Amino acid sequence: MTAFRCFPATSERWSDLENLFGKNGANAGCWCMFWRLERSMFKKTKGEGNRQILKQIVDADKQPGILAYEGNQAVGWCGIAPRPDLIALENSRILKRVDDRAVWSITCFFISREARGKGIMECLIKAAIAHARSNGAQIVEAYPIDMQSPKLLGQVFNSYSGYMGVASAFRTLGFEEVQRASETQLIMRLMIKAHVKRKAK
């Protein structure tokens, strides 16, 4: 398996993120704003407006996601943030809150065409978990599609429909299903264990 290196998206890595997303802003001018903005605002800022908003977030050192590198080139992205930062997710009727516990949400993946099929999704998830843990998170939540659901069973994975990830990748890393949001989509969680420092004897 190809070795990837993953890092939080900081202002120093903005040009790498911009090059990865390209002129299309990852997909249709999204720039990873679909879950961050109210739907009406997203429609207004789609494209260049979303690019500017993402840059402002990165420049403010809010580190809205993880970049994966193959060599010196960014080839993958995973969006992660505290759920309250994701306005559209908070307002979602399908992906509504399971409870009132504080969670960090993994919302999307974008992987360059040449890097697909190399196991990069799991690498990004691991880095996202570490990032959330370093920021004090106790629960990481994800909303992947379930390719084993009767409706999707036997179908070929589609990078667009699976932009929120696939359940099998999350299960491999210890996530558990807490709720079925729809026939094909799950809400999954990973409980992050607190590292307790032992007292010196």
Outline where the language-model segments fall.
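Conserved N-terminal entry element of GNAT/NAT acetyltransferase domains
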Residues: M1-R36, K199-K201
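Conserved acyl-donor/pantetheine-binding loop and adjacent beta-alpha core of acyl/acetyltransferases
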Residues: Q56, A60, Y69, Q73-R116, ...
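Charge-dense, helix-prone N-terminal extensions
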Residues: M1-F4, S15-N19, S40-G47, Q56, ...
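C-terminal "cap" of GNAT-fold acetyltransferases
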Residues: Y160-K201
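Conserved GNAT acetyl-CoA-binding A-motif
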Residues: I125, A132-Y160
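Active-site rim helix/loop that mediates acceptor-substrate recognition in acyltransferases
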Residues: M33-P64
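Conserved acetyl-CoA-binding loop-helix of GNAT-fold acetyltransferases
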Residues: I106-I111, G117-R133
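Conserved beta-strand edge residues that scaffold enzyme active sites
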Residues: N72, D146-M147, T184
